[in-house]
Amino acid sequence: MNMKTIEWKDGELVLIDQRKLPDSLEYFRCRDYRDVIYAIKNMVVRGAPAIGVTAAFGVAMAELAGEDVEVAAEEIKASRPTAVNLFWAVDRVMKSESPLDEAITMYMEDMETNRAIGRHGAGLIEDGDTVLTHCNAGALACVDYGTALGVIRAAWDDGKRLTVICDETRPVGQGARLSVWEMQQEGIPVKLITDVAAGYLMQTGMIDKVIIGADRIAEGGVANKIGSLMVALAAKRFNVPFYVAAPMSTFDTENSIYDIEIEERDPAEVLYYGGCRIAPQDTEAINPAFDIVPSDLISGIITEKGILDPL
């Protein structure tokens, strides 16, 4: 994509409003740190690296406005509990003498990091491969370029012919709405499947690799968008290599993956789709936003430093 998910313009943070895609490309302007919290909570911006950079600018905006930065930092941290990049970014900016300069540095680093991830991962993809990805770990999940989709972009730019399979990623549909859109912008062949079709495609030999992103990597496994575990289990059963692509900032070296908080989102996301109710009245729904892929299901973790073993 030739556009940035996040841009700092004239004292405002301008975000692609991902709730509007793919129907329209609109922007959401954050004029203070409270707008940043709204954007993160309501998935105007999503994806661990993008949330981290957005949070960094949120702290900077609080400092520039003369707000209580400590209070702002804690409120920003509380906006989404599972993505470790959020906490890492806020803590890093808080230690800086100039929060705005540090946020801009992190913005630039994110672009460089994603391209390094792409370079390291591109060699895993062979000419003619069909690659399955879950949710959206592309340019829209970062400042630009992406992690999992960055690997696919890099392989495509290397001249490899490939096909991308995106699952829809219920309940919010990030695969259908965002990943398919990104691949179409690049002219990379892409097909959409329902979430429950992934196992069948692997069983019948239609998938050569799986590459997903991550919201947190810790001892014992990886936390990523709900549904990642089912994809990983099918990949293990049918001997399909399963890779995670993420920056080093997504690593949490202080906790077990099973000790982290898994965000529970509004049940309405499950009960409604496209504004239409899809279940009977008075139906109760459970809506965890993430699940955990154990380390033994992961073939490798693609980072800016190379391909690493799972923790």
Swiss-Prot record:
Q: Where is the active site?
A: 215
Any Pfam family hit: IF-2B
* GO BP term, example: L-methionine salvage from methylthioadenosine
Instruction: Name the site position(s) for Transition state stabilizer.
Output: 135
What Gene3D superfamilies does the database record attribute to this sequence?
translation initiation factor eif-2b, domain 1 (1.20.120.420), Translation initiation factor eif-2b, domain 2 (3.40.50.10470)
Q: Any keyword Amino-acid biosynthesis?
A: yes
UniProt entry keywords in alphabetical sequence: Amino-acid biosynthesis, Isomerase, Methionine biosynthesis
Q: What does this protein do?
A: Catalyzes the interconversion of methylthioribose-1-phosphate (MTR-1-P) into methylthioribulose-1-phosphate (MTRu-1-P).
In Swiss-Prot or TrEMBL terms, this protein is called Putative methylthioribose-1-phosphate isomerase
